[in-house]
Curated annotation (Swiss-Prot):
Induction: Induced methyl jasmonate (MeJA) in adventitious roots. Induced by A.niger mycelium-derived elicitor, thus improving ginsenosides production in adventitious roots culture. Its EC number is 2.5.1.21. PROSITE patterns: SQUALEN_PHYTOEN_SYN_1, SQUALEN_PHYTOEN_SYN_2. One of its GO terms (cellular component) is endoplasmic reticulum membrane. PANTHER family: FARNESYL-DIPHOSPHATE FARNESYLTRANSFERASE (PTHR11626), SQUALENE SYNTHASE (PTHR11626:SF2). It comes from Panax ginseng (Korean ginseng). Its cofactor is Mg(2+); Mn(2+). The chain crosses the membrane at residues 281-301, 391-411. The keyword Phosphoprotein does not apply. This is Squalene synthase 12. Its main location: endoplasmic reticulum. It is a multi-pass membrane protein.
Length: 415
């Protein structure tokens, strides 16, 4: 759960955090007993706890398909991300990955921590994949093949132009959006979304991650991972790594804001995609990551900390998003709130200020035209200020009771 200091600063986070903790425990207890599926769901919770929680809410067959789809692509991504693997070894593996998923003896040792376990024990994923219905298998194979080919292309070339950047993000994330749309359609729960809208869903998430992970990627050992397009960063510095140096802070922030502005172009497509969804579980599955993305962009925008350390939404706000995202009006409300926060951070002297404001106003216009903004609680902005003293008192009472209980039950009795 969130730290005590964070909870005291944002007491309204306490209940959503508690609910999230209980939901996580419940999800862990729902892991199937069959060995291959037990491995897959256990691994899912290890590589992405919040994603694992949302997947669990899907219907049984779709849930299994999405779980395997996620793990297959996570394994493919682990190979691509491992900078210790030579190009000569890496390219054939990613190109043939769609074949490896049919081979229940295949594995390849790479990655670290839980990702290494996923790769070493990949036969569990392959066996579970083979249990899926044919329409699910065909969709997963097709996307894996196309993604592997795209990754191979960019292993051998750098991201130079914005078109390159969009193409790379299409291969590693836009195709995920296309694949999920195919799985939703195969389940009979949704109409097949257009490739354009599905692609934007993936690009919005991927570009957010690339922006947020600048420092981690540039400091990667033995070789930096560089995804920011030269067409953008070369306007501000001579080398991409120069952005992390303090003497370049002003230029670095301008470059960062340029990157965020580029990502915002996909927001309206994302709103359209989500507004077309019918199933509540699929809707939440899609909506929660998108809200997290625009929230993360709002935190990163105009923030030098992106070049100094980790920038991410606090756990309590994440818990609120997971707890309170139920309808499209919640999504419009969150996008409107975060676009307001972004708008408040725009410096009129920034070279991209006009373009940034234009894109934010377009998002706000779409949210307003939905006619639903008045129906939702604006928890994202309002809860940032002010302390609920009653809730703080309750938290201290609960902590006191817990302390008393632990003291009486765990400490040795005095004779």
């Amino acid at each position: 759960m969130g730290s005590l200091g964070a909870i005291l600063k944002h007491p309204d986070d306490f209940y959503p955090l508690l609910k999230l903790k209980i939901a996580a425990r419940h999800a862990e207890k729902q892991i199937p007993s069959e060995p291959h599926w037990a491995f897959c769901y256990s691994m899912l919770h290890k590589v992405s706890r919040s994603f694992g929680l949302v997947i669990q809410q899907l219907g049984p067959q779709l849930r299994d398909a999405v779980c395997i789809f996620y793990l297959v692509l996570r394994a493919l991504d682990t190979v691509e991300d491992d900078t210790s693997i030579s190009t000569e070894v890496k390219v054939p593996i990613v190109m043939a990955f769609h074949c490896h998923i049919y081979d229940n003896d295949w594995h390849f040792s790479c990655g670290t921590k839980e990702y290494k376990v996923l790769m070493d024990e990949f036969h569990h994923v392959s066996n579970a994949f083979l249990d899926l219905g044919s329409s699910y298998k065909e969709a997963i194979e097709d996307i894996t093949m196309r993604m592997g080919a795209g990754m191979a292309k960019f292993i051998c070339k750098e991201v130079e132009t914005i078109d390159d950047y969009d193409e790379y993000c299409h291969y590693v994330a836009g195709l995920v959006g296309l694949g999920l749309s195919k799985l939703f359609h195969a389940s009979g729960a949704e109409d097949l979304a257009t490739d354009s809208l599905s692609n934007s869903m993936g690009l919005f998430l991927q570009k957010t991650n690339i922006i947020r992970d600048y420092l981690e990627d540039i400091n990667e050992i033995p070789k930096s991972r560089m995804f920011w397009p030269r067409q953008i960063w070369s306007k501000y510095v001579d080398k991409l790594e120069d952005l992390k140096y303090e003497e370049n802070s002003a230029k670095a922030v301008q470059c960062l804001n340029d990157m965020v502005t580029d990502a915002l172009v996909h927001a309206e497509d994302c709103l359209k995609y989500m507004s077309d969804l019918r199933g509540p579980a699929i809707f939440r599955f899609c909506a929660i990551p998108q809200i997290m993305a625009i929230g993360t962009l709002a935190l990163c925008f105009n923030n030098t900390q992106v070049f100094r350390g980790v920038v991410k939404m606090r756990r309590g706000l994440t818990a609120k998003v997971i707890d309170q995202t139920k309808t499209m009006s919640d999504v419009y409300g969150a996008f409107f709130d975060f676009s307001c926060l972004l708008k408040s951070k725009v410096d009129n002297n920034d070279p991209n200020a006009t373009k940034t404001l234009s894109r934010l106003e377009a998002i706000q216009k779409t949210c307003k035209e939905s006619g639903t903004l008045s129906k939702r609680k604006s928890y994202i902005i309002e809860s940032e200020s002010g302390h609920n003293s009653a809730l703080i008192a309750i938290i201290f009472i609960i902590l006191a009771i817990l302390y008393a209980y632990l003291s009486s039950n765990l400490l040795p009795n005095k004779q």
